[in-house]
A protein has these predicted regions:
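Compositionally biased intrinsically disordered regions enriched in Thr/Gly
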Residues: 19-280
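Secreted/luminal cysteine- and crosslink-motif detector
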Residues: 7-8, 19
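Bacterial N-terminal signal peptides that target proteins for export
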Residues: 1-7
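C-terminal motif of bacterial Sec signal peptides marking the signal peptidase cleavage site
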Residues: 14-17
Length: 280
């Protein structure tokens, strides 16, 4: 089966200007960051969530920003959706203020800023859901930047859950998954290069940048399965520059659940079955 995924992430450190202009104030969009409680109170209950916007947009001469959210997320996890909306609103407001300040400080070198945030519900099984995000930002440099994000949430608690939590032997699971990730990324890099280098050559280069430990520390989410109501595996995201050059862009690798199933905690094993749903 195949699925189109429109993803997006809160987690890009905006690049500074590369020209002769003085450095612009940095705006950081930190991966996985939580707003202080007073800044992002989840909306309680479905009736309150009706008032939460599902799309945010800012259009000014110095800043253009937007944030969009998967409609399904409001149905299955309204409180989580509300928190993501408020988080995105705060980030848009922060970059708006940053852009305005830089424009006032150095109008001759200023270029309008932009920020786009998207969140998609990727998969759900049992008490867990997995979200995928995409963030694209420009803060006056030679080019913009973008990044992907992945988050797993518990519907019962509304809190984020790490893949590590689901595994009885996290290190063993990542060690088993590493060869699969290396081969997958190497094949993608070879295809992007148009056959300029073999997948085996890229595999060696990729192995210098990726380890079992780095995968476990990375952006990890769960993916839908060919069997309804189950997870088919996990996905690991790599931002631009993390593996190759900026021109290569971001990468992600999907590891089938069959690769790491033996390392799952018994209470979570039943949530995994079938094969991963892949993108077209």
């Amino acid at each position: 089966m195949s699925r189109l995924a429109c993803c997006a992430a809160l987690g890009v450190v905006l690049i500074a200007s590369c020209g002769k202009a003085p450095d612009a104030p940095d705006t950081e969009v930190t991966q996985g960051a939580e707003l202080p409680a007073e800044a992002a109170q989840p909306v309680a209950g479905p009736e309150a969530v009706v008032e939460v916007p599902r799309h945010l947009e800012v259009t000014k001469d110095y800043f253009v920003g937007s944030a969009s959210f998967d409609d399904a997320l409001f149905d299955i996890a309204p409180d989580i959706a509300a928190t993501l909306v408020e988080d995105a609103r705060a980030r848009l407001d922060a970059m708006d203020a940053d852009a305005l300040a830089y424009k006032a400080a150095d109008p001759d070198y200023f270029n309008p800023y932009s920020l786009s945030i998207q969140w998609t519900l990727d998969a759900a099984a049992g008490d867990l859901i997995s979200l995928e995000g995409f963030t694209a930002a420009y803060s006056g440099g030679a080019h913009g930047n973008y990044g992907t994000d992945a988050r797993i949430y518990s519907l019962q608690t509304g809190q984020q859950v790490s893949l590590r939590t689901l595994l009885a032997d996290p290190q063993g699971a990542m060690t088993e998954s590493l060869p699969f990730v290396l081969s997958d990324i190497a094949q993608q890099r070879s295809e992007k290069a148009g056959g300029g280098a073999s997948a085996e050559t890229f595999r060696g280069e990729t192995a210098d940048a990726i380890s079992a430990d780095s995968i476990l520390r990375g952006e990890l989410g769960l993916v839908a399965s060919t069997e309804a109501g189950r997870f088919g595996g996990f996905v690991v995201h790599f931002a631009p520059y993390e593996i190759g050059s900026y021109a290569e862009g971001a990468y992600k690798a999907v590891v089938p659940q069959s690769v790491f199933r033996d390392f799952l905690k018994p209470e979570y094993a039943g949530l995994f079955a079938g094969g991963p749903v892949t993108e077209e």
